[in-house]
Design a protein with these regions (language model features):
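Well-structured core secondary-structure elements of compact alpha/beta domains
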Residues: 1-26, 41-56, 86-92
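Proteostasis/folding factors centered on peptidyl-prolyl cis-trans isomerases
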Residues: 1-8, 60-92
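Glycine-centered tight-turn and secondary-structure capping sites
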Residues: 26-31, 71
């Protein structure tokens, strides 16, 4: 079964998501941005979601996590929870 590790930042608006993505692409640390801005409890751990299998997260997550490039910031990804930036840190 495929497994992946990822981290994310959850915010309420697409605009905020885009602004945070620009900060990260300009050199800000993903984990620090997650700690400061993410609405998810994982933000306290730098957005780390740990390791999970296909189907354990919402469909929109799976599509990015199991097909997107590693160590790149993906998003905004819209789910029922809000807007996410995702970074896939490993995949097997």
């Amino acid at each position: 079964m495929s497994q992946a590790s990822a981290r994310h930042i959850l915010v309420d608006s697409e605009q905020q998501c885009l602004e945070l993505k620009q900060q990260i692409e300009a050199g800000s640390d993903f984990a620090e941005v997650a700690r400061q801005h993410s609405n998810c409890p994982s933000g306290r751990q730098g957005g780390e979601l740990g390791t999970f299998g296909r189907g354990q997260m919402v469909k929109e997550f799976d599509e990015v996590v199991f097909s997107g490039a590693l160590n790149e910031v993906h998003g905004p990804v819209k789910t029922q929870f809000g807007y996410h930036l995702l970074e896939v840190t490993s995949r097997t």
